[in-house]
Amino acid sequence: MNTDLAGLGPDVVLEDTSIQRTVRRGDGEVHRWQKDGDYHVQVLHWAVSDRNDWERIKTRHLAADDPSRFPPDWEAEVERLRARDYPLQLIHWGVYGFARTLMGDEALAFAFYDDPGLVHDILDTYTTLALHIWERMTAVLDFDLIECWEDMAYRSGCLISPATFRHFLQPQYRRIRAFADAHRIPIVLVDSDGYIEPLTALMLESGVNALYPFEVQSGNDVASMLHTHPMLGALGGLDKRVMSQGRTAMDVELERAHTLIRIGRFIPGPDHFVLSDVTYANYAYFMRGLRQVVMETRPGS
């Protein structure tokens, strides 16, 4: 189900060389994609630079009743999902995150002050769209969690202040939590890279009750967070870099997973995507070891 922009049409390739490709998307974004390395995309022109851009996207690409949002075999998919033996989630492309993907971090940071009405409209319009689509989905299926993609922090700290979060983001998160409660969905999970601790208490106040991936190199301390916030669930939290540092480093991190699981409310995993300097042998060793840790360790043990 598409809870993002709809009806974009095909990308237009502006340049294609042996090392990079430059593409214009249907929403107007132009980005350069590097063909090697771990971090590939550089945005050259954002889709929204002013209110006119936003009105164009809002009118053309954010219709909740666009038939392309649901697959043609939706009814068959529903029957398949009703028989599942795994958790099922609803996707929200972020309160901050959705605006960020349209405007970029810098322009959005200015817009919070220079055009707050525009920011409120983007955030409110997108969450209204998501809730509308979710209503149709929850009418025929039960869901276990709602995941919100945010990425509102880097290694050195958060991209927004607590005051900005409270004023702009909190009202939308409370709408999401109200929807979750009304449909007996217990978990609202936020995905944000970087050092997210300064916003954690506000997220919990707003209805979020689980976070991931708790990047280690950004300074996140999962154990401290779990002890400080007894209603918080955590996922990730294991340093992905150890998979390129050898078995001794991996064993130390796996032992740390034991300790964190014992605290409770924690599902261990790499704290970001695995980088290209990791061999398959090292990856397999770490993941097999992690599986054993998970199967053998219980909260409170």
Report each predicted region and the residues it spans.
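Segments that shape or occlude catalytic/ligand-binding pockets
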Residues: M1-D11
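Glycine-centered secondary-structure boundary/capping sites
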Residues: M1-N2, I19, G28, A153
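Active-site loop segments of alpha/beta catalytic cores
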Residues: R24, R51, R56-S301
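A contiguous, low-structure linker/loop signature
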Residues: G9-A64, A83-R84
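Generic structural signal for short, solvent-exposed loop/turn connectors between secondary structure elements
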Residues: M1, T17-I19, P230, Q245-G246
